[in-house]
Regions:
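Extracellular parallel beta-helix/beta-solenoid repeat domains
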Residues: 1-217
Length: 217
């Protein structure tokens, strides 16, 4: 029963299991959207470029992300502040162009593509928050900032992308890939200018075993 724009009363047919306690979050799964975000120009945003968070399919294709202040793309999720929608289960980010994102460090500015669910106790997680994220055939024209940051993500692929570095802004001097409690990561067939090859030394790993990251140049 809807009592107001911010309050619902839910009547259950059976008692809740003992594991459900006060403070747990509930979502209406009937209203999860799928998303196709295609052929748009996202330019000069003061925060992140675009934020996507839904368990349904997400396709981000053929867009220009130009000089966003923070991350160009943010996959979020939490039940403690913003109450962004639940975990992403299938995300494809392909054939986009990213130009000099992360020109400031205001908020959620860990990388050009930032997968940032807000999880208080990662070590106590029984499963990963996000999963099945494919980043392919994109062009990054960027100064020296991290390309990809992820927390609690399983099956993450960064493949067949082109990265062209410039000196338009002062570099951060950080590793291009940063993973915090992630698994099944593939970094493959990416082209970098000026030429370089990536190794596990280009990854900052927290609570992520090195054998969960496969790099093929």
């Amino acid at each position: 029963v809807k009592k107001s724009s911010t309050e619902l009363v839910i009547t259950l047919e059976e008692p809740l299991p003992p594991s459900v306690k006060a403070g747990d979050a509930v979502e209406n799964a009937d209203f999860y959207p799928s998303v196709v975000f295609r052929n748009n120009i996202v330019r000069n945003n003061r925060a992140r470029g675009s934020l996507f968070t839904t368990p349904e399919k997400v396709l981000v294709e053929g867009n220009l992300f130009d000089h966003s202040s923070g991350a160009a793309i943010l996959l979020a999720g939490d039940a403690q502040g913003w109450y962004e929608s639940g975990a992403c289960h299938e995300v494809v980010i392909r054939r986009n162009t990213f130009i000099n994102n992360l020109t400031s460090r205001y908020q959620f500015t860990n990388a050009i593509i930032s997968i940032y669910p807000e999880v208080k106790q990662l070590n106590k997680q029984k499963d990963y928050y996000h999963r099945n994220v494919l980043i392919e055939n994109n062009v990054f024209k960027t100064f020296d900032v991290p390309l990809l940051f992820a927390i609690s993500t399983d099956n993450l692929k960064f493949v067949n992308n082109k990265i062209i570095y410039n000196n338009d802004f002062r570099g951060w001097g950080q590793k291009p890939f940063q993973f915090r409690r992630c698994a099944n990561i593939l970094i493959k067939n990416n082209k970098v200018q000026p030429p370089r090859t990536w190794s596990i030394e280009d990854c900052k790993l927290e609570n992520t075993p090195a054998d969960q990251v496969r790099i093929e140049n």
